[in-house]
From Swiss-Prot:
Comment block on domains: Consists of two structural and functional domains: an N-terminal DNA-binding domain, approximately the first 60 residues, and a larger C-terminal domain, approximately 280 residues, which imparts the function of corepressor binding and oligomerization.
Molecular-function annotations in GO: DNA-binding transcription factor activity; transcription cis-regulatory region binding
Name of the protein described by the UniProt record: HTH-type transcriptional repressor PurR
Domain HTH lacI-type residues, every copy: 2-56
Sorted UniProt keywords: DNA-binding, Purine biosynthesis, Repressor, Transcription, Transcription regulation
Residue sites binding hypoxanthine per the record: 73, 189, 191, 220, 274
Keyword Repressor part of the UniProt annotation: yes
């Protein structure tokens, strides 16, 4: 593998001149520049990314720490982030944590060693350990992409889960539903709890109370939606509608409903959350709460690039508002 010394020798110049040509850190005569570039091409020389970053103070790379890249919601955001990074000439290092503090620590240390220009963080929950870890890397520009901790060292983008939960509850109430269940991820998780609180607000505005037997907790997985729905179907008294904490739980719930010989929305109305790509292809197409994954990813990167350019600027909190997407999984009881 060729070195910078080999390039300098072939071009008949100093290693300093070669460095200036590569990093564009000083004017070099056009003829000399051409000779150096020809030598680089002949030797197939590739400068060390780390060495170059020490010269120009950028690696043109971003780190992204997520709970998991398998879940459809995370996967769609990651795709949007990677696409925007590519268009801006940046590379993306993706790190999955499964909310394991040890993994978060190792990933943060690895990203710091690779001298990434900044880090995006998107975890479904933040433990005390992970918050402390993030504070210890506060010299790195960092944007938290979900509900996020209140941290003066990071910018935040809020997804307004409370507002989304309210929109879901209100849509069901407006369609004449009074007996409504909530299939939730663990309520200790902020996202699930905020969606539930917004949902309760819509019920209370309509003078309705939540039946505690119809509040079932699982996780953000289709298996949990399936199992929770089966527990609901086993009860003597059943709701007319089900609000699911996310779309994949809703798909699991619909599977349980159809297995038992019931139909959506004729027998049970179902509404999801996130508007992941597959939700429009369920049977029937799923009514859901839309969060623009492309807008979230692009806005997070814009904010991170701003922070990379100016590390001393005041930290920002930006809100992204969810929207109701009406398809065919909710029955209007007012017409019957």
């Amino acid at each position: 593998m060729a070195t910078i010394k080999d390039v300098a020798k072939l071009a008949g110049v100093s290693t300093t001149t070669v460095s200036h040509v590569i990093n564009e850190t000083r004017h070099v005569a056009e003829e000399t520049k051409k000779i150096v570039l020809n030598a680089i091409e002949q030797l197939h020389y590739s400068p060390s990314a780390v060495a170059r970053s020490l010269k120009v103070n950028t690696t043109k790379s971003i780190g992204m720490i997520v709970t998991t890249s398998e879940a459809p919601y995370f996967a769609e955001i990651i795709h949007a982030v990677e696409d925007h990074c590519y268009r801006q000439g940046y590379s993306l290092f993706l790190c999955n944590t499964q909310n394991n503090p040890e993994k978060i620590k190792n990933h943060l240390e690895m990203l710091a060693k690779k001298r990434v220009d900044g880090i995006l963080v998107m975890c479904s929950e933040y433990t005390a350990d992970s918050l402390d870890l993030m504070k210890s890397f506060s010299d790195l520009p960092m944007v938290v992409m979900d509900w996020g901790p209140v941290n003066p060292n990071t910018d935040r983008i809020l997804d307004n889960s409370f507002e989304g939960g309210y929109l879901a509850g209100k849509h069901l109430v407006d369609n004449g539903h009074k007996e409504i269940a909530y299939l939730s991820a663990e309520l200790k998780k902020t996202t699930a709890r905020k969606r539930y609180e917004g949902f309760l607000k819509a019920l209370h505005e309509a003078g309705l109370e939540m039946n505690p037997d119809w509040l079932l907790e699982g996780s953000f997985e289709p298996e949990d939606g399936y199992e929770c729905m089966n527990r609901l179907l086993a009860q003597e008294f059943r709701p007319t509608a089900i609000f699911c904490c996310n779309d994949v739980m809703a798909l699991g719930a619909i599977s349980a409903i159809t297995e038992k010989g019931f139909r959506v929305p004729e027998d049970f109305s179902v509404i999801g959350y996130d508007n992941v790509h597959i939700s429009r292809f369920s049977a029937p197409p799923l009514t859901t709460i839309h969060q623009s994954k492309a807008r979230l990813g692009e806005r997070a990167l814009q904010l991170l690039f701003e922070r990379i350019q100016d590390k001393t600027a005041k930290r920002e909190t930006i809100e992204i508002h969810p929207e109701l997407v009406i398809r065919k999984s909710v029955k209007n009881l007012n017409r019957h």
